[in-house]
A protein has these predicted regions:
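Long amphipathic alpha-helical segments
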Residues: 1-48
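Short Gly/Ser/Thr- and Asp/Glu-enriched loop/turn motifs at secondary-structure junctions
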Residues: 4, 59-63, 122, 274-278, ...
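Glycine-rich phosphate-binding segment of PLP-dependent enzymes
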Residues: 26-27, 31, 61-62, 71-93
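Long amphipathic N-terminal alpha/beta scaffold segment
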Residues: 36-75, 104
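Conserved PLP-enzyme active-site core in the AAT-like
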Residues: 93-316, 348
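Conserved PLP-dependent catalytic core of the aminotransferase class-I/II
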Residues: 143-144, 306-309, 313-365
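Conserved C-terminal alpha-helix-loop-beta "cap" of PLP-dependent enzymes
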Residues: 341-413
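Conserved small/polar residues in nucleotide/adenosyl-binding loops
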Residues: 416-418
């Protein structure tokens, strides 16, 4: 059988992959004991797959702002590496408190007594419940059946609660939960807490009823209980800013600040959704409870990296200084239809491929605002008439990721941060 060597395969390849990986791919293909032509073809295909799988910057033209598979919120990362005073008191030249400035500025933004940061919002919920069980002696979690959620990636709320060793007490029905349901559960389950979950990735309409945070707070106070609000999506942008920028799709979306004002002892939310920063979980509220979470043995296993904390600090500062529009997510959302049309025109003026500019809608994605859309003009190109276009887009120096709809390549420019 005509064979080819590893060196021969590797020498003829132009790739940015480390040589050791290329050699490994070549050896794997040679071990299949095929003829030279087949080996070369298999090697090229495997190398192609590896190259596409390398984590890299891409251009999101899908029309989904918080695309979970593309990293959710786009950010301006200004941290260039090196050492950082993440836990250092520069003034006194000694060890200091971890991310002290971020804590202060986030409390100022949210109106919270204290705050802490973990690596994602699932961790926020888990470490909160575990701490309230271990430190505060809670034995069960009371939750409405209409709020027992599942989100992308097979995250199911009951499974998280089960891992905390707390008993989950389901109350009400899918569409209706009343204050009397909570009251009955509190009486029947000693040392319980109430968990209210924001249905950020689906909605229930019609014959529905739920209990607001103010009424739940009054109830927990009279029963020596605790009220937790898992907001998930985590809107913190001010109503004044949204009104100024004519953004009305968030009119029915609760903000973190509103949840705290209405009485939630602890509120948790994601940093990479409507907050517009990097993947993280943010827990805000009662100082004593937050301190207990920070002192938990679990906290070190879930805490954020210096890069994440730096970016959270940068994003928080923009909110505090009323410069929300500088946050890439809000800059994209606030862009008006005419601006997008002009952006498309500047690109399509010299575009030789047959195309159409059509009306479409962008969506938030990331498990947020399931029934809301943002009007957006898009470039539509027939995939059937341009069979090589998709390959050219994904093989661009910075891969361009469009979406496919009914054999059309759709390029939405509203998500390109300039």
């Amino acid at each position: 059988m005509d064979k080819i060597s590893v060196n021969k395969l590797v020498e003829e390849v132009k790739s940015n992959l480390p040589r050791e990986i290329i050699v490994s791919i070549a050896q794997s293909c040679l071990n299949e004991n095929t003829d030279s032509q087949t080996t070369i073809k298999n090697f090229e295909n495997e190398l192609y797959k590896y190259t596409l799988n390398v984590q890299k910057k891409v251009i999101n033209c899908t029309g989904t702002l918080l695309h979970t598979n593309l990293g959710r919120a786009q950010t301006d990362i200004n941290f260039t590496g090196g050492s950082t005073n993440i836990e250092y008191d520069i003034l006194n030249n000694r060890r200091g408190k971890r991310n002290e400035f971020l804590n202060q500025s986030m409390n100022l933004l949210l109106g919270s007594e204290d705050v802490c940061f973990v690596n994602n919002n699932a961790s926020s919920l888990y470490i909160t419940l575990k701490t309230l069980k271990n430190i505060y002696g809670k034995k069960s979690v009371i939750i409405s059946r209409g709020e027992i959620i599942e989100i992308g990636g097979s995250y199911r709320l009951p499974e998280i609660i089960q891992e905390t060793d707390l008993k989950m007490v389901e109350i009400g029905t899918t569409n209706k939960t009343k204050i009397t349901d909570y009251e009955k559960a509190l009486k029947e389950n000693e040392d319980s807490l109430i968990l209210k979950v924001h249905r950020s990735n689906f909605s229930i309409n019609g014959f529905v009823e739920e209990v607001n945070l103010k009424d739940l707070k009054s109830l927990t106070e009279s029963h020596n209980s605790i009220l937790i609000h898992d907001l998930g999506s985590g809107l913190v942008a001010s109503r004044k800013f949204l009104e100024k920028e004519n953004i009305d799709i968030f009119d029915d979306e609760p903000t973190v600040q509103e949840s705290l004002r209405q009485g939630a002892d602890l509120v948790m939310f994601s940093g990479d959704k409507l907050f517009g920063s990097l993947q993280s979980g943010i827990i805000a509220g009662d100082k004593e409870m937050i301190q207990s979470i920070k002192e938990s043995p679990l906290f070190r296993t879930y805490r954020c990296s210096p890069l994440t904390l730096f970016e959270l600090q940068e994003t928080t500062n923009k909110y505090v200084s009323k410069n929300e529009i500088e946050i890439p997510l809000w800059k994209m959302i606030a862009m008006n239809y005419e601006e997008l049309e002009n952006r498309i025109k500047s690109i399509t003026e010299n575009l030789k491929i047959k195309h159409e500019v059509v009306h479409d809608n962008s969506v938030m994605g990331g498990g947020t605002l399931p029934n809301k859309f943002i009007a957006s003009p898009v470039i539509q190109i027939s995939e059937l008439e341009n069979t090589n276009l998709m390959s050219k887009l994904i093989h661009n120096e910075i891969p361009i990721i469009p979406r496919i709809n009914k054999n059309n390549i759709i390029i939405d420019l509203s998500l390109i941060h300039i």
